[in-house]
Curated annotation (Swiss-Prot):
InterPro entries: GPCR_Rhodpsn, GPCR_Rhodpsn_7TM, Orexin_rcpt, OX1R. The record marks W36 as: Important for responses to orexin. Residues 1-24 are annotated as: Disordered. The gene is HCRTR1. The antagonists suvorexant and SB-674042 bind at the cognate neuropeptide binding site that is situated between the transmembrane helices and accessible from the extracellular side of the membrane. SUPFAM superfamilies: Family A G protein-coupled receptor-like. Glycans are attached at N194. Belongs to the G-protein coupled receptor 1 family. This is Orexin/Hypocretin receptor type 1. It is a multi-pass membrane protein.
Amino acid sequence: MEPSATPGAQMGVPPGSREPSPVPPDYEDEFLRYLWRDYLYPKQYEWVLIAAYVAVFVVALVGNTLVCLAVWRNHHMRTVTNYFIVNLSLADVLVTAICLPASLLVDITESWLFGHALCKVIPYLQAVSVSVAVLTLSFIALDRWYAICHPLLFKSTARRARGSILGIWAVSLAIMVPQAAVMECSSVLPELANRTRLFSVCDERWADDLYPKIYHSCFFIVTYLAPLGLMAMAYFQIFRKLWGRQIPGTTSALVRNWKRPSDQLGDLEQGLSGEPQPRARAFLAEVKQMRARRKTAKMLMVVLLVFALCYLPISVLNVLKRVFGMFRQASDREAVYACFTFSHWLVYANSAANPIIYNFLSGKFREQFKAAFSCCLPGLGPCGSLKAPSPRSSASHKSLSLQSRCSISKISEHVVLTSVTTVLP
């Protein structure tokens, strides 16, 4: 992991402290106990870090598991966008369950305790999860861009989404093989290597100093800078399309005010009083679709923004360290250590933030989360069902929804019919 300032290189008995007896038989054991007591045991602020990691671990695992269950058990939620959201949740579960505990131990002890094999596997899975997350967010942005800005150019289907997800994992597993190839485990204190794994480090080993500069420059561009730039342009066009233009066939006053319940009745009466009911229903359906697309776009923009903010510190620090060679002789070691440690925590916090975003910005996910928690926590109310509603109840709900949505159009139709009957002889 990245905060690896060579622990043990600065170790030794501090000046002014009592020197140990000259090489007693148990000198190495005493030395290890000294290091554990004065160096490895978590400090007060590190206990705060441990608590933060535990909170992220619980929220990320529970939240992303609920996201997967909600889509799996509800056929009406199996949309193209939700398929990609589930894939993002699977990547978050992977990195949380496997990589987070190892990262926490490395950040606290500054030692790699998991041996040579996992030194290659865990960083490799970490890099794969980053690639999967970036590619998934890119495919979501591309799908929304086609659906909203160019609906006639490409038809997105669930089958194509599943194929894209398989391609995302295949590409990510392939392009991150160099990350596993260069990882090696070594001991800072070779004389203690046979007795303890403390002060072992898992770091990259390159044949030439130029290779890591090229690799990490490309890694930063491919997994962060270029995708975020393209996604920002896509969402900018989506924003202009959804918020900058009116619905075709309607007046601008209606489009500006359709979200305001207090003005909706008057505007609809003014704009639709001369239209028959089918056109009014078509207009309301168009407004409903516009509202749903705006909510989805808003949620996805927030997910992308949080991802960019959470991955920005570690991306910049990696470039500074690997490309420009900084932090090798850091004068303020504690500050550098704190920066890397916090940046690691932010990466995992992003995995916990996504389900929270879905809960606040998606009514369907919020309903499923509430149903799941009501089953586990009786105090929250009656236990709901995570399964999709029956056809009869769904039809009844749809009928009630249509009735509420069309109540205003019925008022307009009543005004039209009244005026017609008064004019007729």
